[in-house]
Amino acid sequence: GNSPYTDELLKAAHAPREKTAIPVRVGDPSPIKHVIYVIKENRTYDQVLGDISEGNGDPDLCLFGEDVTPNQHALAREFVLLDNFYVDAEVSADGHNWSMGAYATDYVEKTWPTNYSRRGRTYDYEGSKKISRPTRGYIWDYCARAGITYRSYGEFVGIKDVKPGGGGDADQNLDRAPGPEYFTSEENLQGHFSPIFPPYNLAISDLTRVDRWLDEFHEFEKNGRLPQFQIVRLGNNHTQGTRPGVPTPRAYVAENDLALGRLVEAVTNSKYWPETAIFVLEDDAQNGPDHVDAHRSIAFVISPYTKRRFVDSTMYSTSGMLRTMELILGLPPMSQYDAAATPMYNSFTNKAELTPYKHRPARIDLAEKNPANAPGALRSMQMNFEKEDAAPDVEFNEIIWKSVRGADSQMPAPVRSAFVKVIDDDDHEKEIPRKKRK
């Protein structure tokens, strides 16, 4: 048939052309012992990295370039620039399922359009209903069965008593006793999520989240108990559009960028750095502007074993990133999709370079707030930002576009492309040429 999946892929991935730190067979050893998986929200490649000349970007579509995201630009340049990475999902409802399970169930895929079109369904896609779960669960369930230590920072975690959408006000409540209560409905996350790390809530700064993550990370450095696998959710690059009085889209994205930079700096200066890999992606791309495809997105791999100052244009996906992490941890694939996906071999080498990363300070004012007369302010006030992606994606994207480019600017329509991959007689994948910027 036409499917790239075979049962043999459950035990071993397609072999790379050269040996790297990523094992081929499930269970084979890797010099990487700790994986940190950072999940962000909703940006396309061109929106953030379209201004990097080394990659296949379109600067005309770049909204959050190097002045807004200096850390993501530095990480792409100092480590690996991935300019052909695609998210598997359409929106956050299926995006967090794909990002944690390499699959979204039939229930999720058939019901999220009803929820997103505001026709009466609740958002029950991140652990609140068992029917939305894959049969064998998410990546933490696989870790639990394999005896891999793991911890979630905000992913599939809820918050009980901080009102979302307040534009930073909730930060002031976090340190008040007894403080907000976090919870999870996931059985295998009970006792495995941080009780001090705030989950998704746009009223809480990503810098606060990283402060809380750093508190635990430094404690792990002292006691030697760093989990083998961590999931860290930094989602404020979602933004609240131009809702008056809250951070502008540029400020939200810049805050998120600084938080990521500080996390990477801490890891690369720690005793765990020689055997750690950090993987970063967006859960979905929110149907945003990109000259190749609306699913093309930013992603980063950061490790002593990643190549340095290297452009990797291999076609990768959410499932391929998961497959790479699974191979490092000795986990089997979770679905036919990560089983058949291309692992990120080409981004890695088998020789370590331990040069640490130094975070870049923000270049714009992180306290910049939307004025009452910002383009789309009224519609932004009417949109629901309590859950990620609850706002209509095209309209929300247009508001973000106009907030950066001006009220009279026109956002281009989303691009859809077809992709074909063939496998030659030596079992190596070849990609049909993709769209290049003119």
Where are these predicted regions, by residue range?
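N-terminal pro-sequences and low-complexity stem/linker regions of secreted or lumenal proteins
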Residues: 2-438
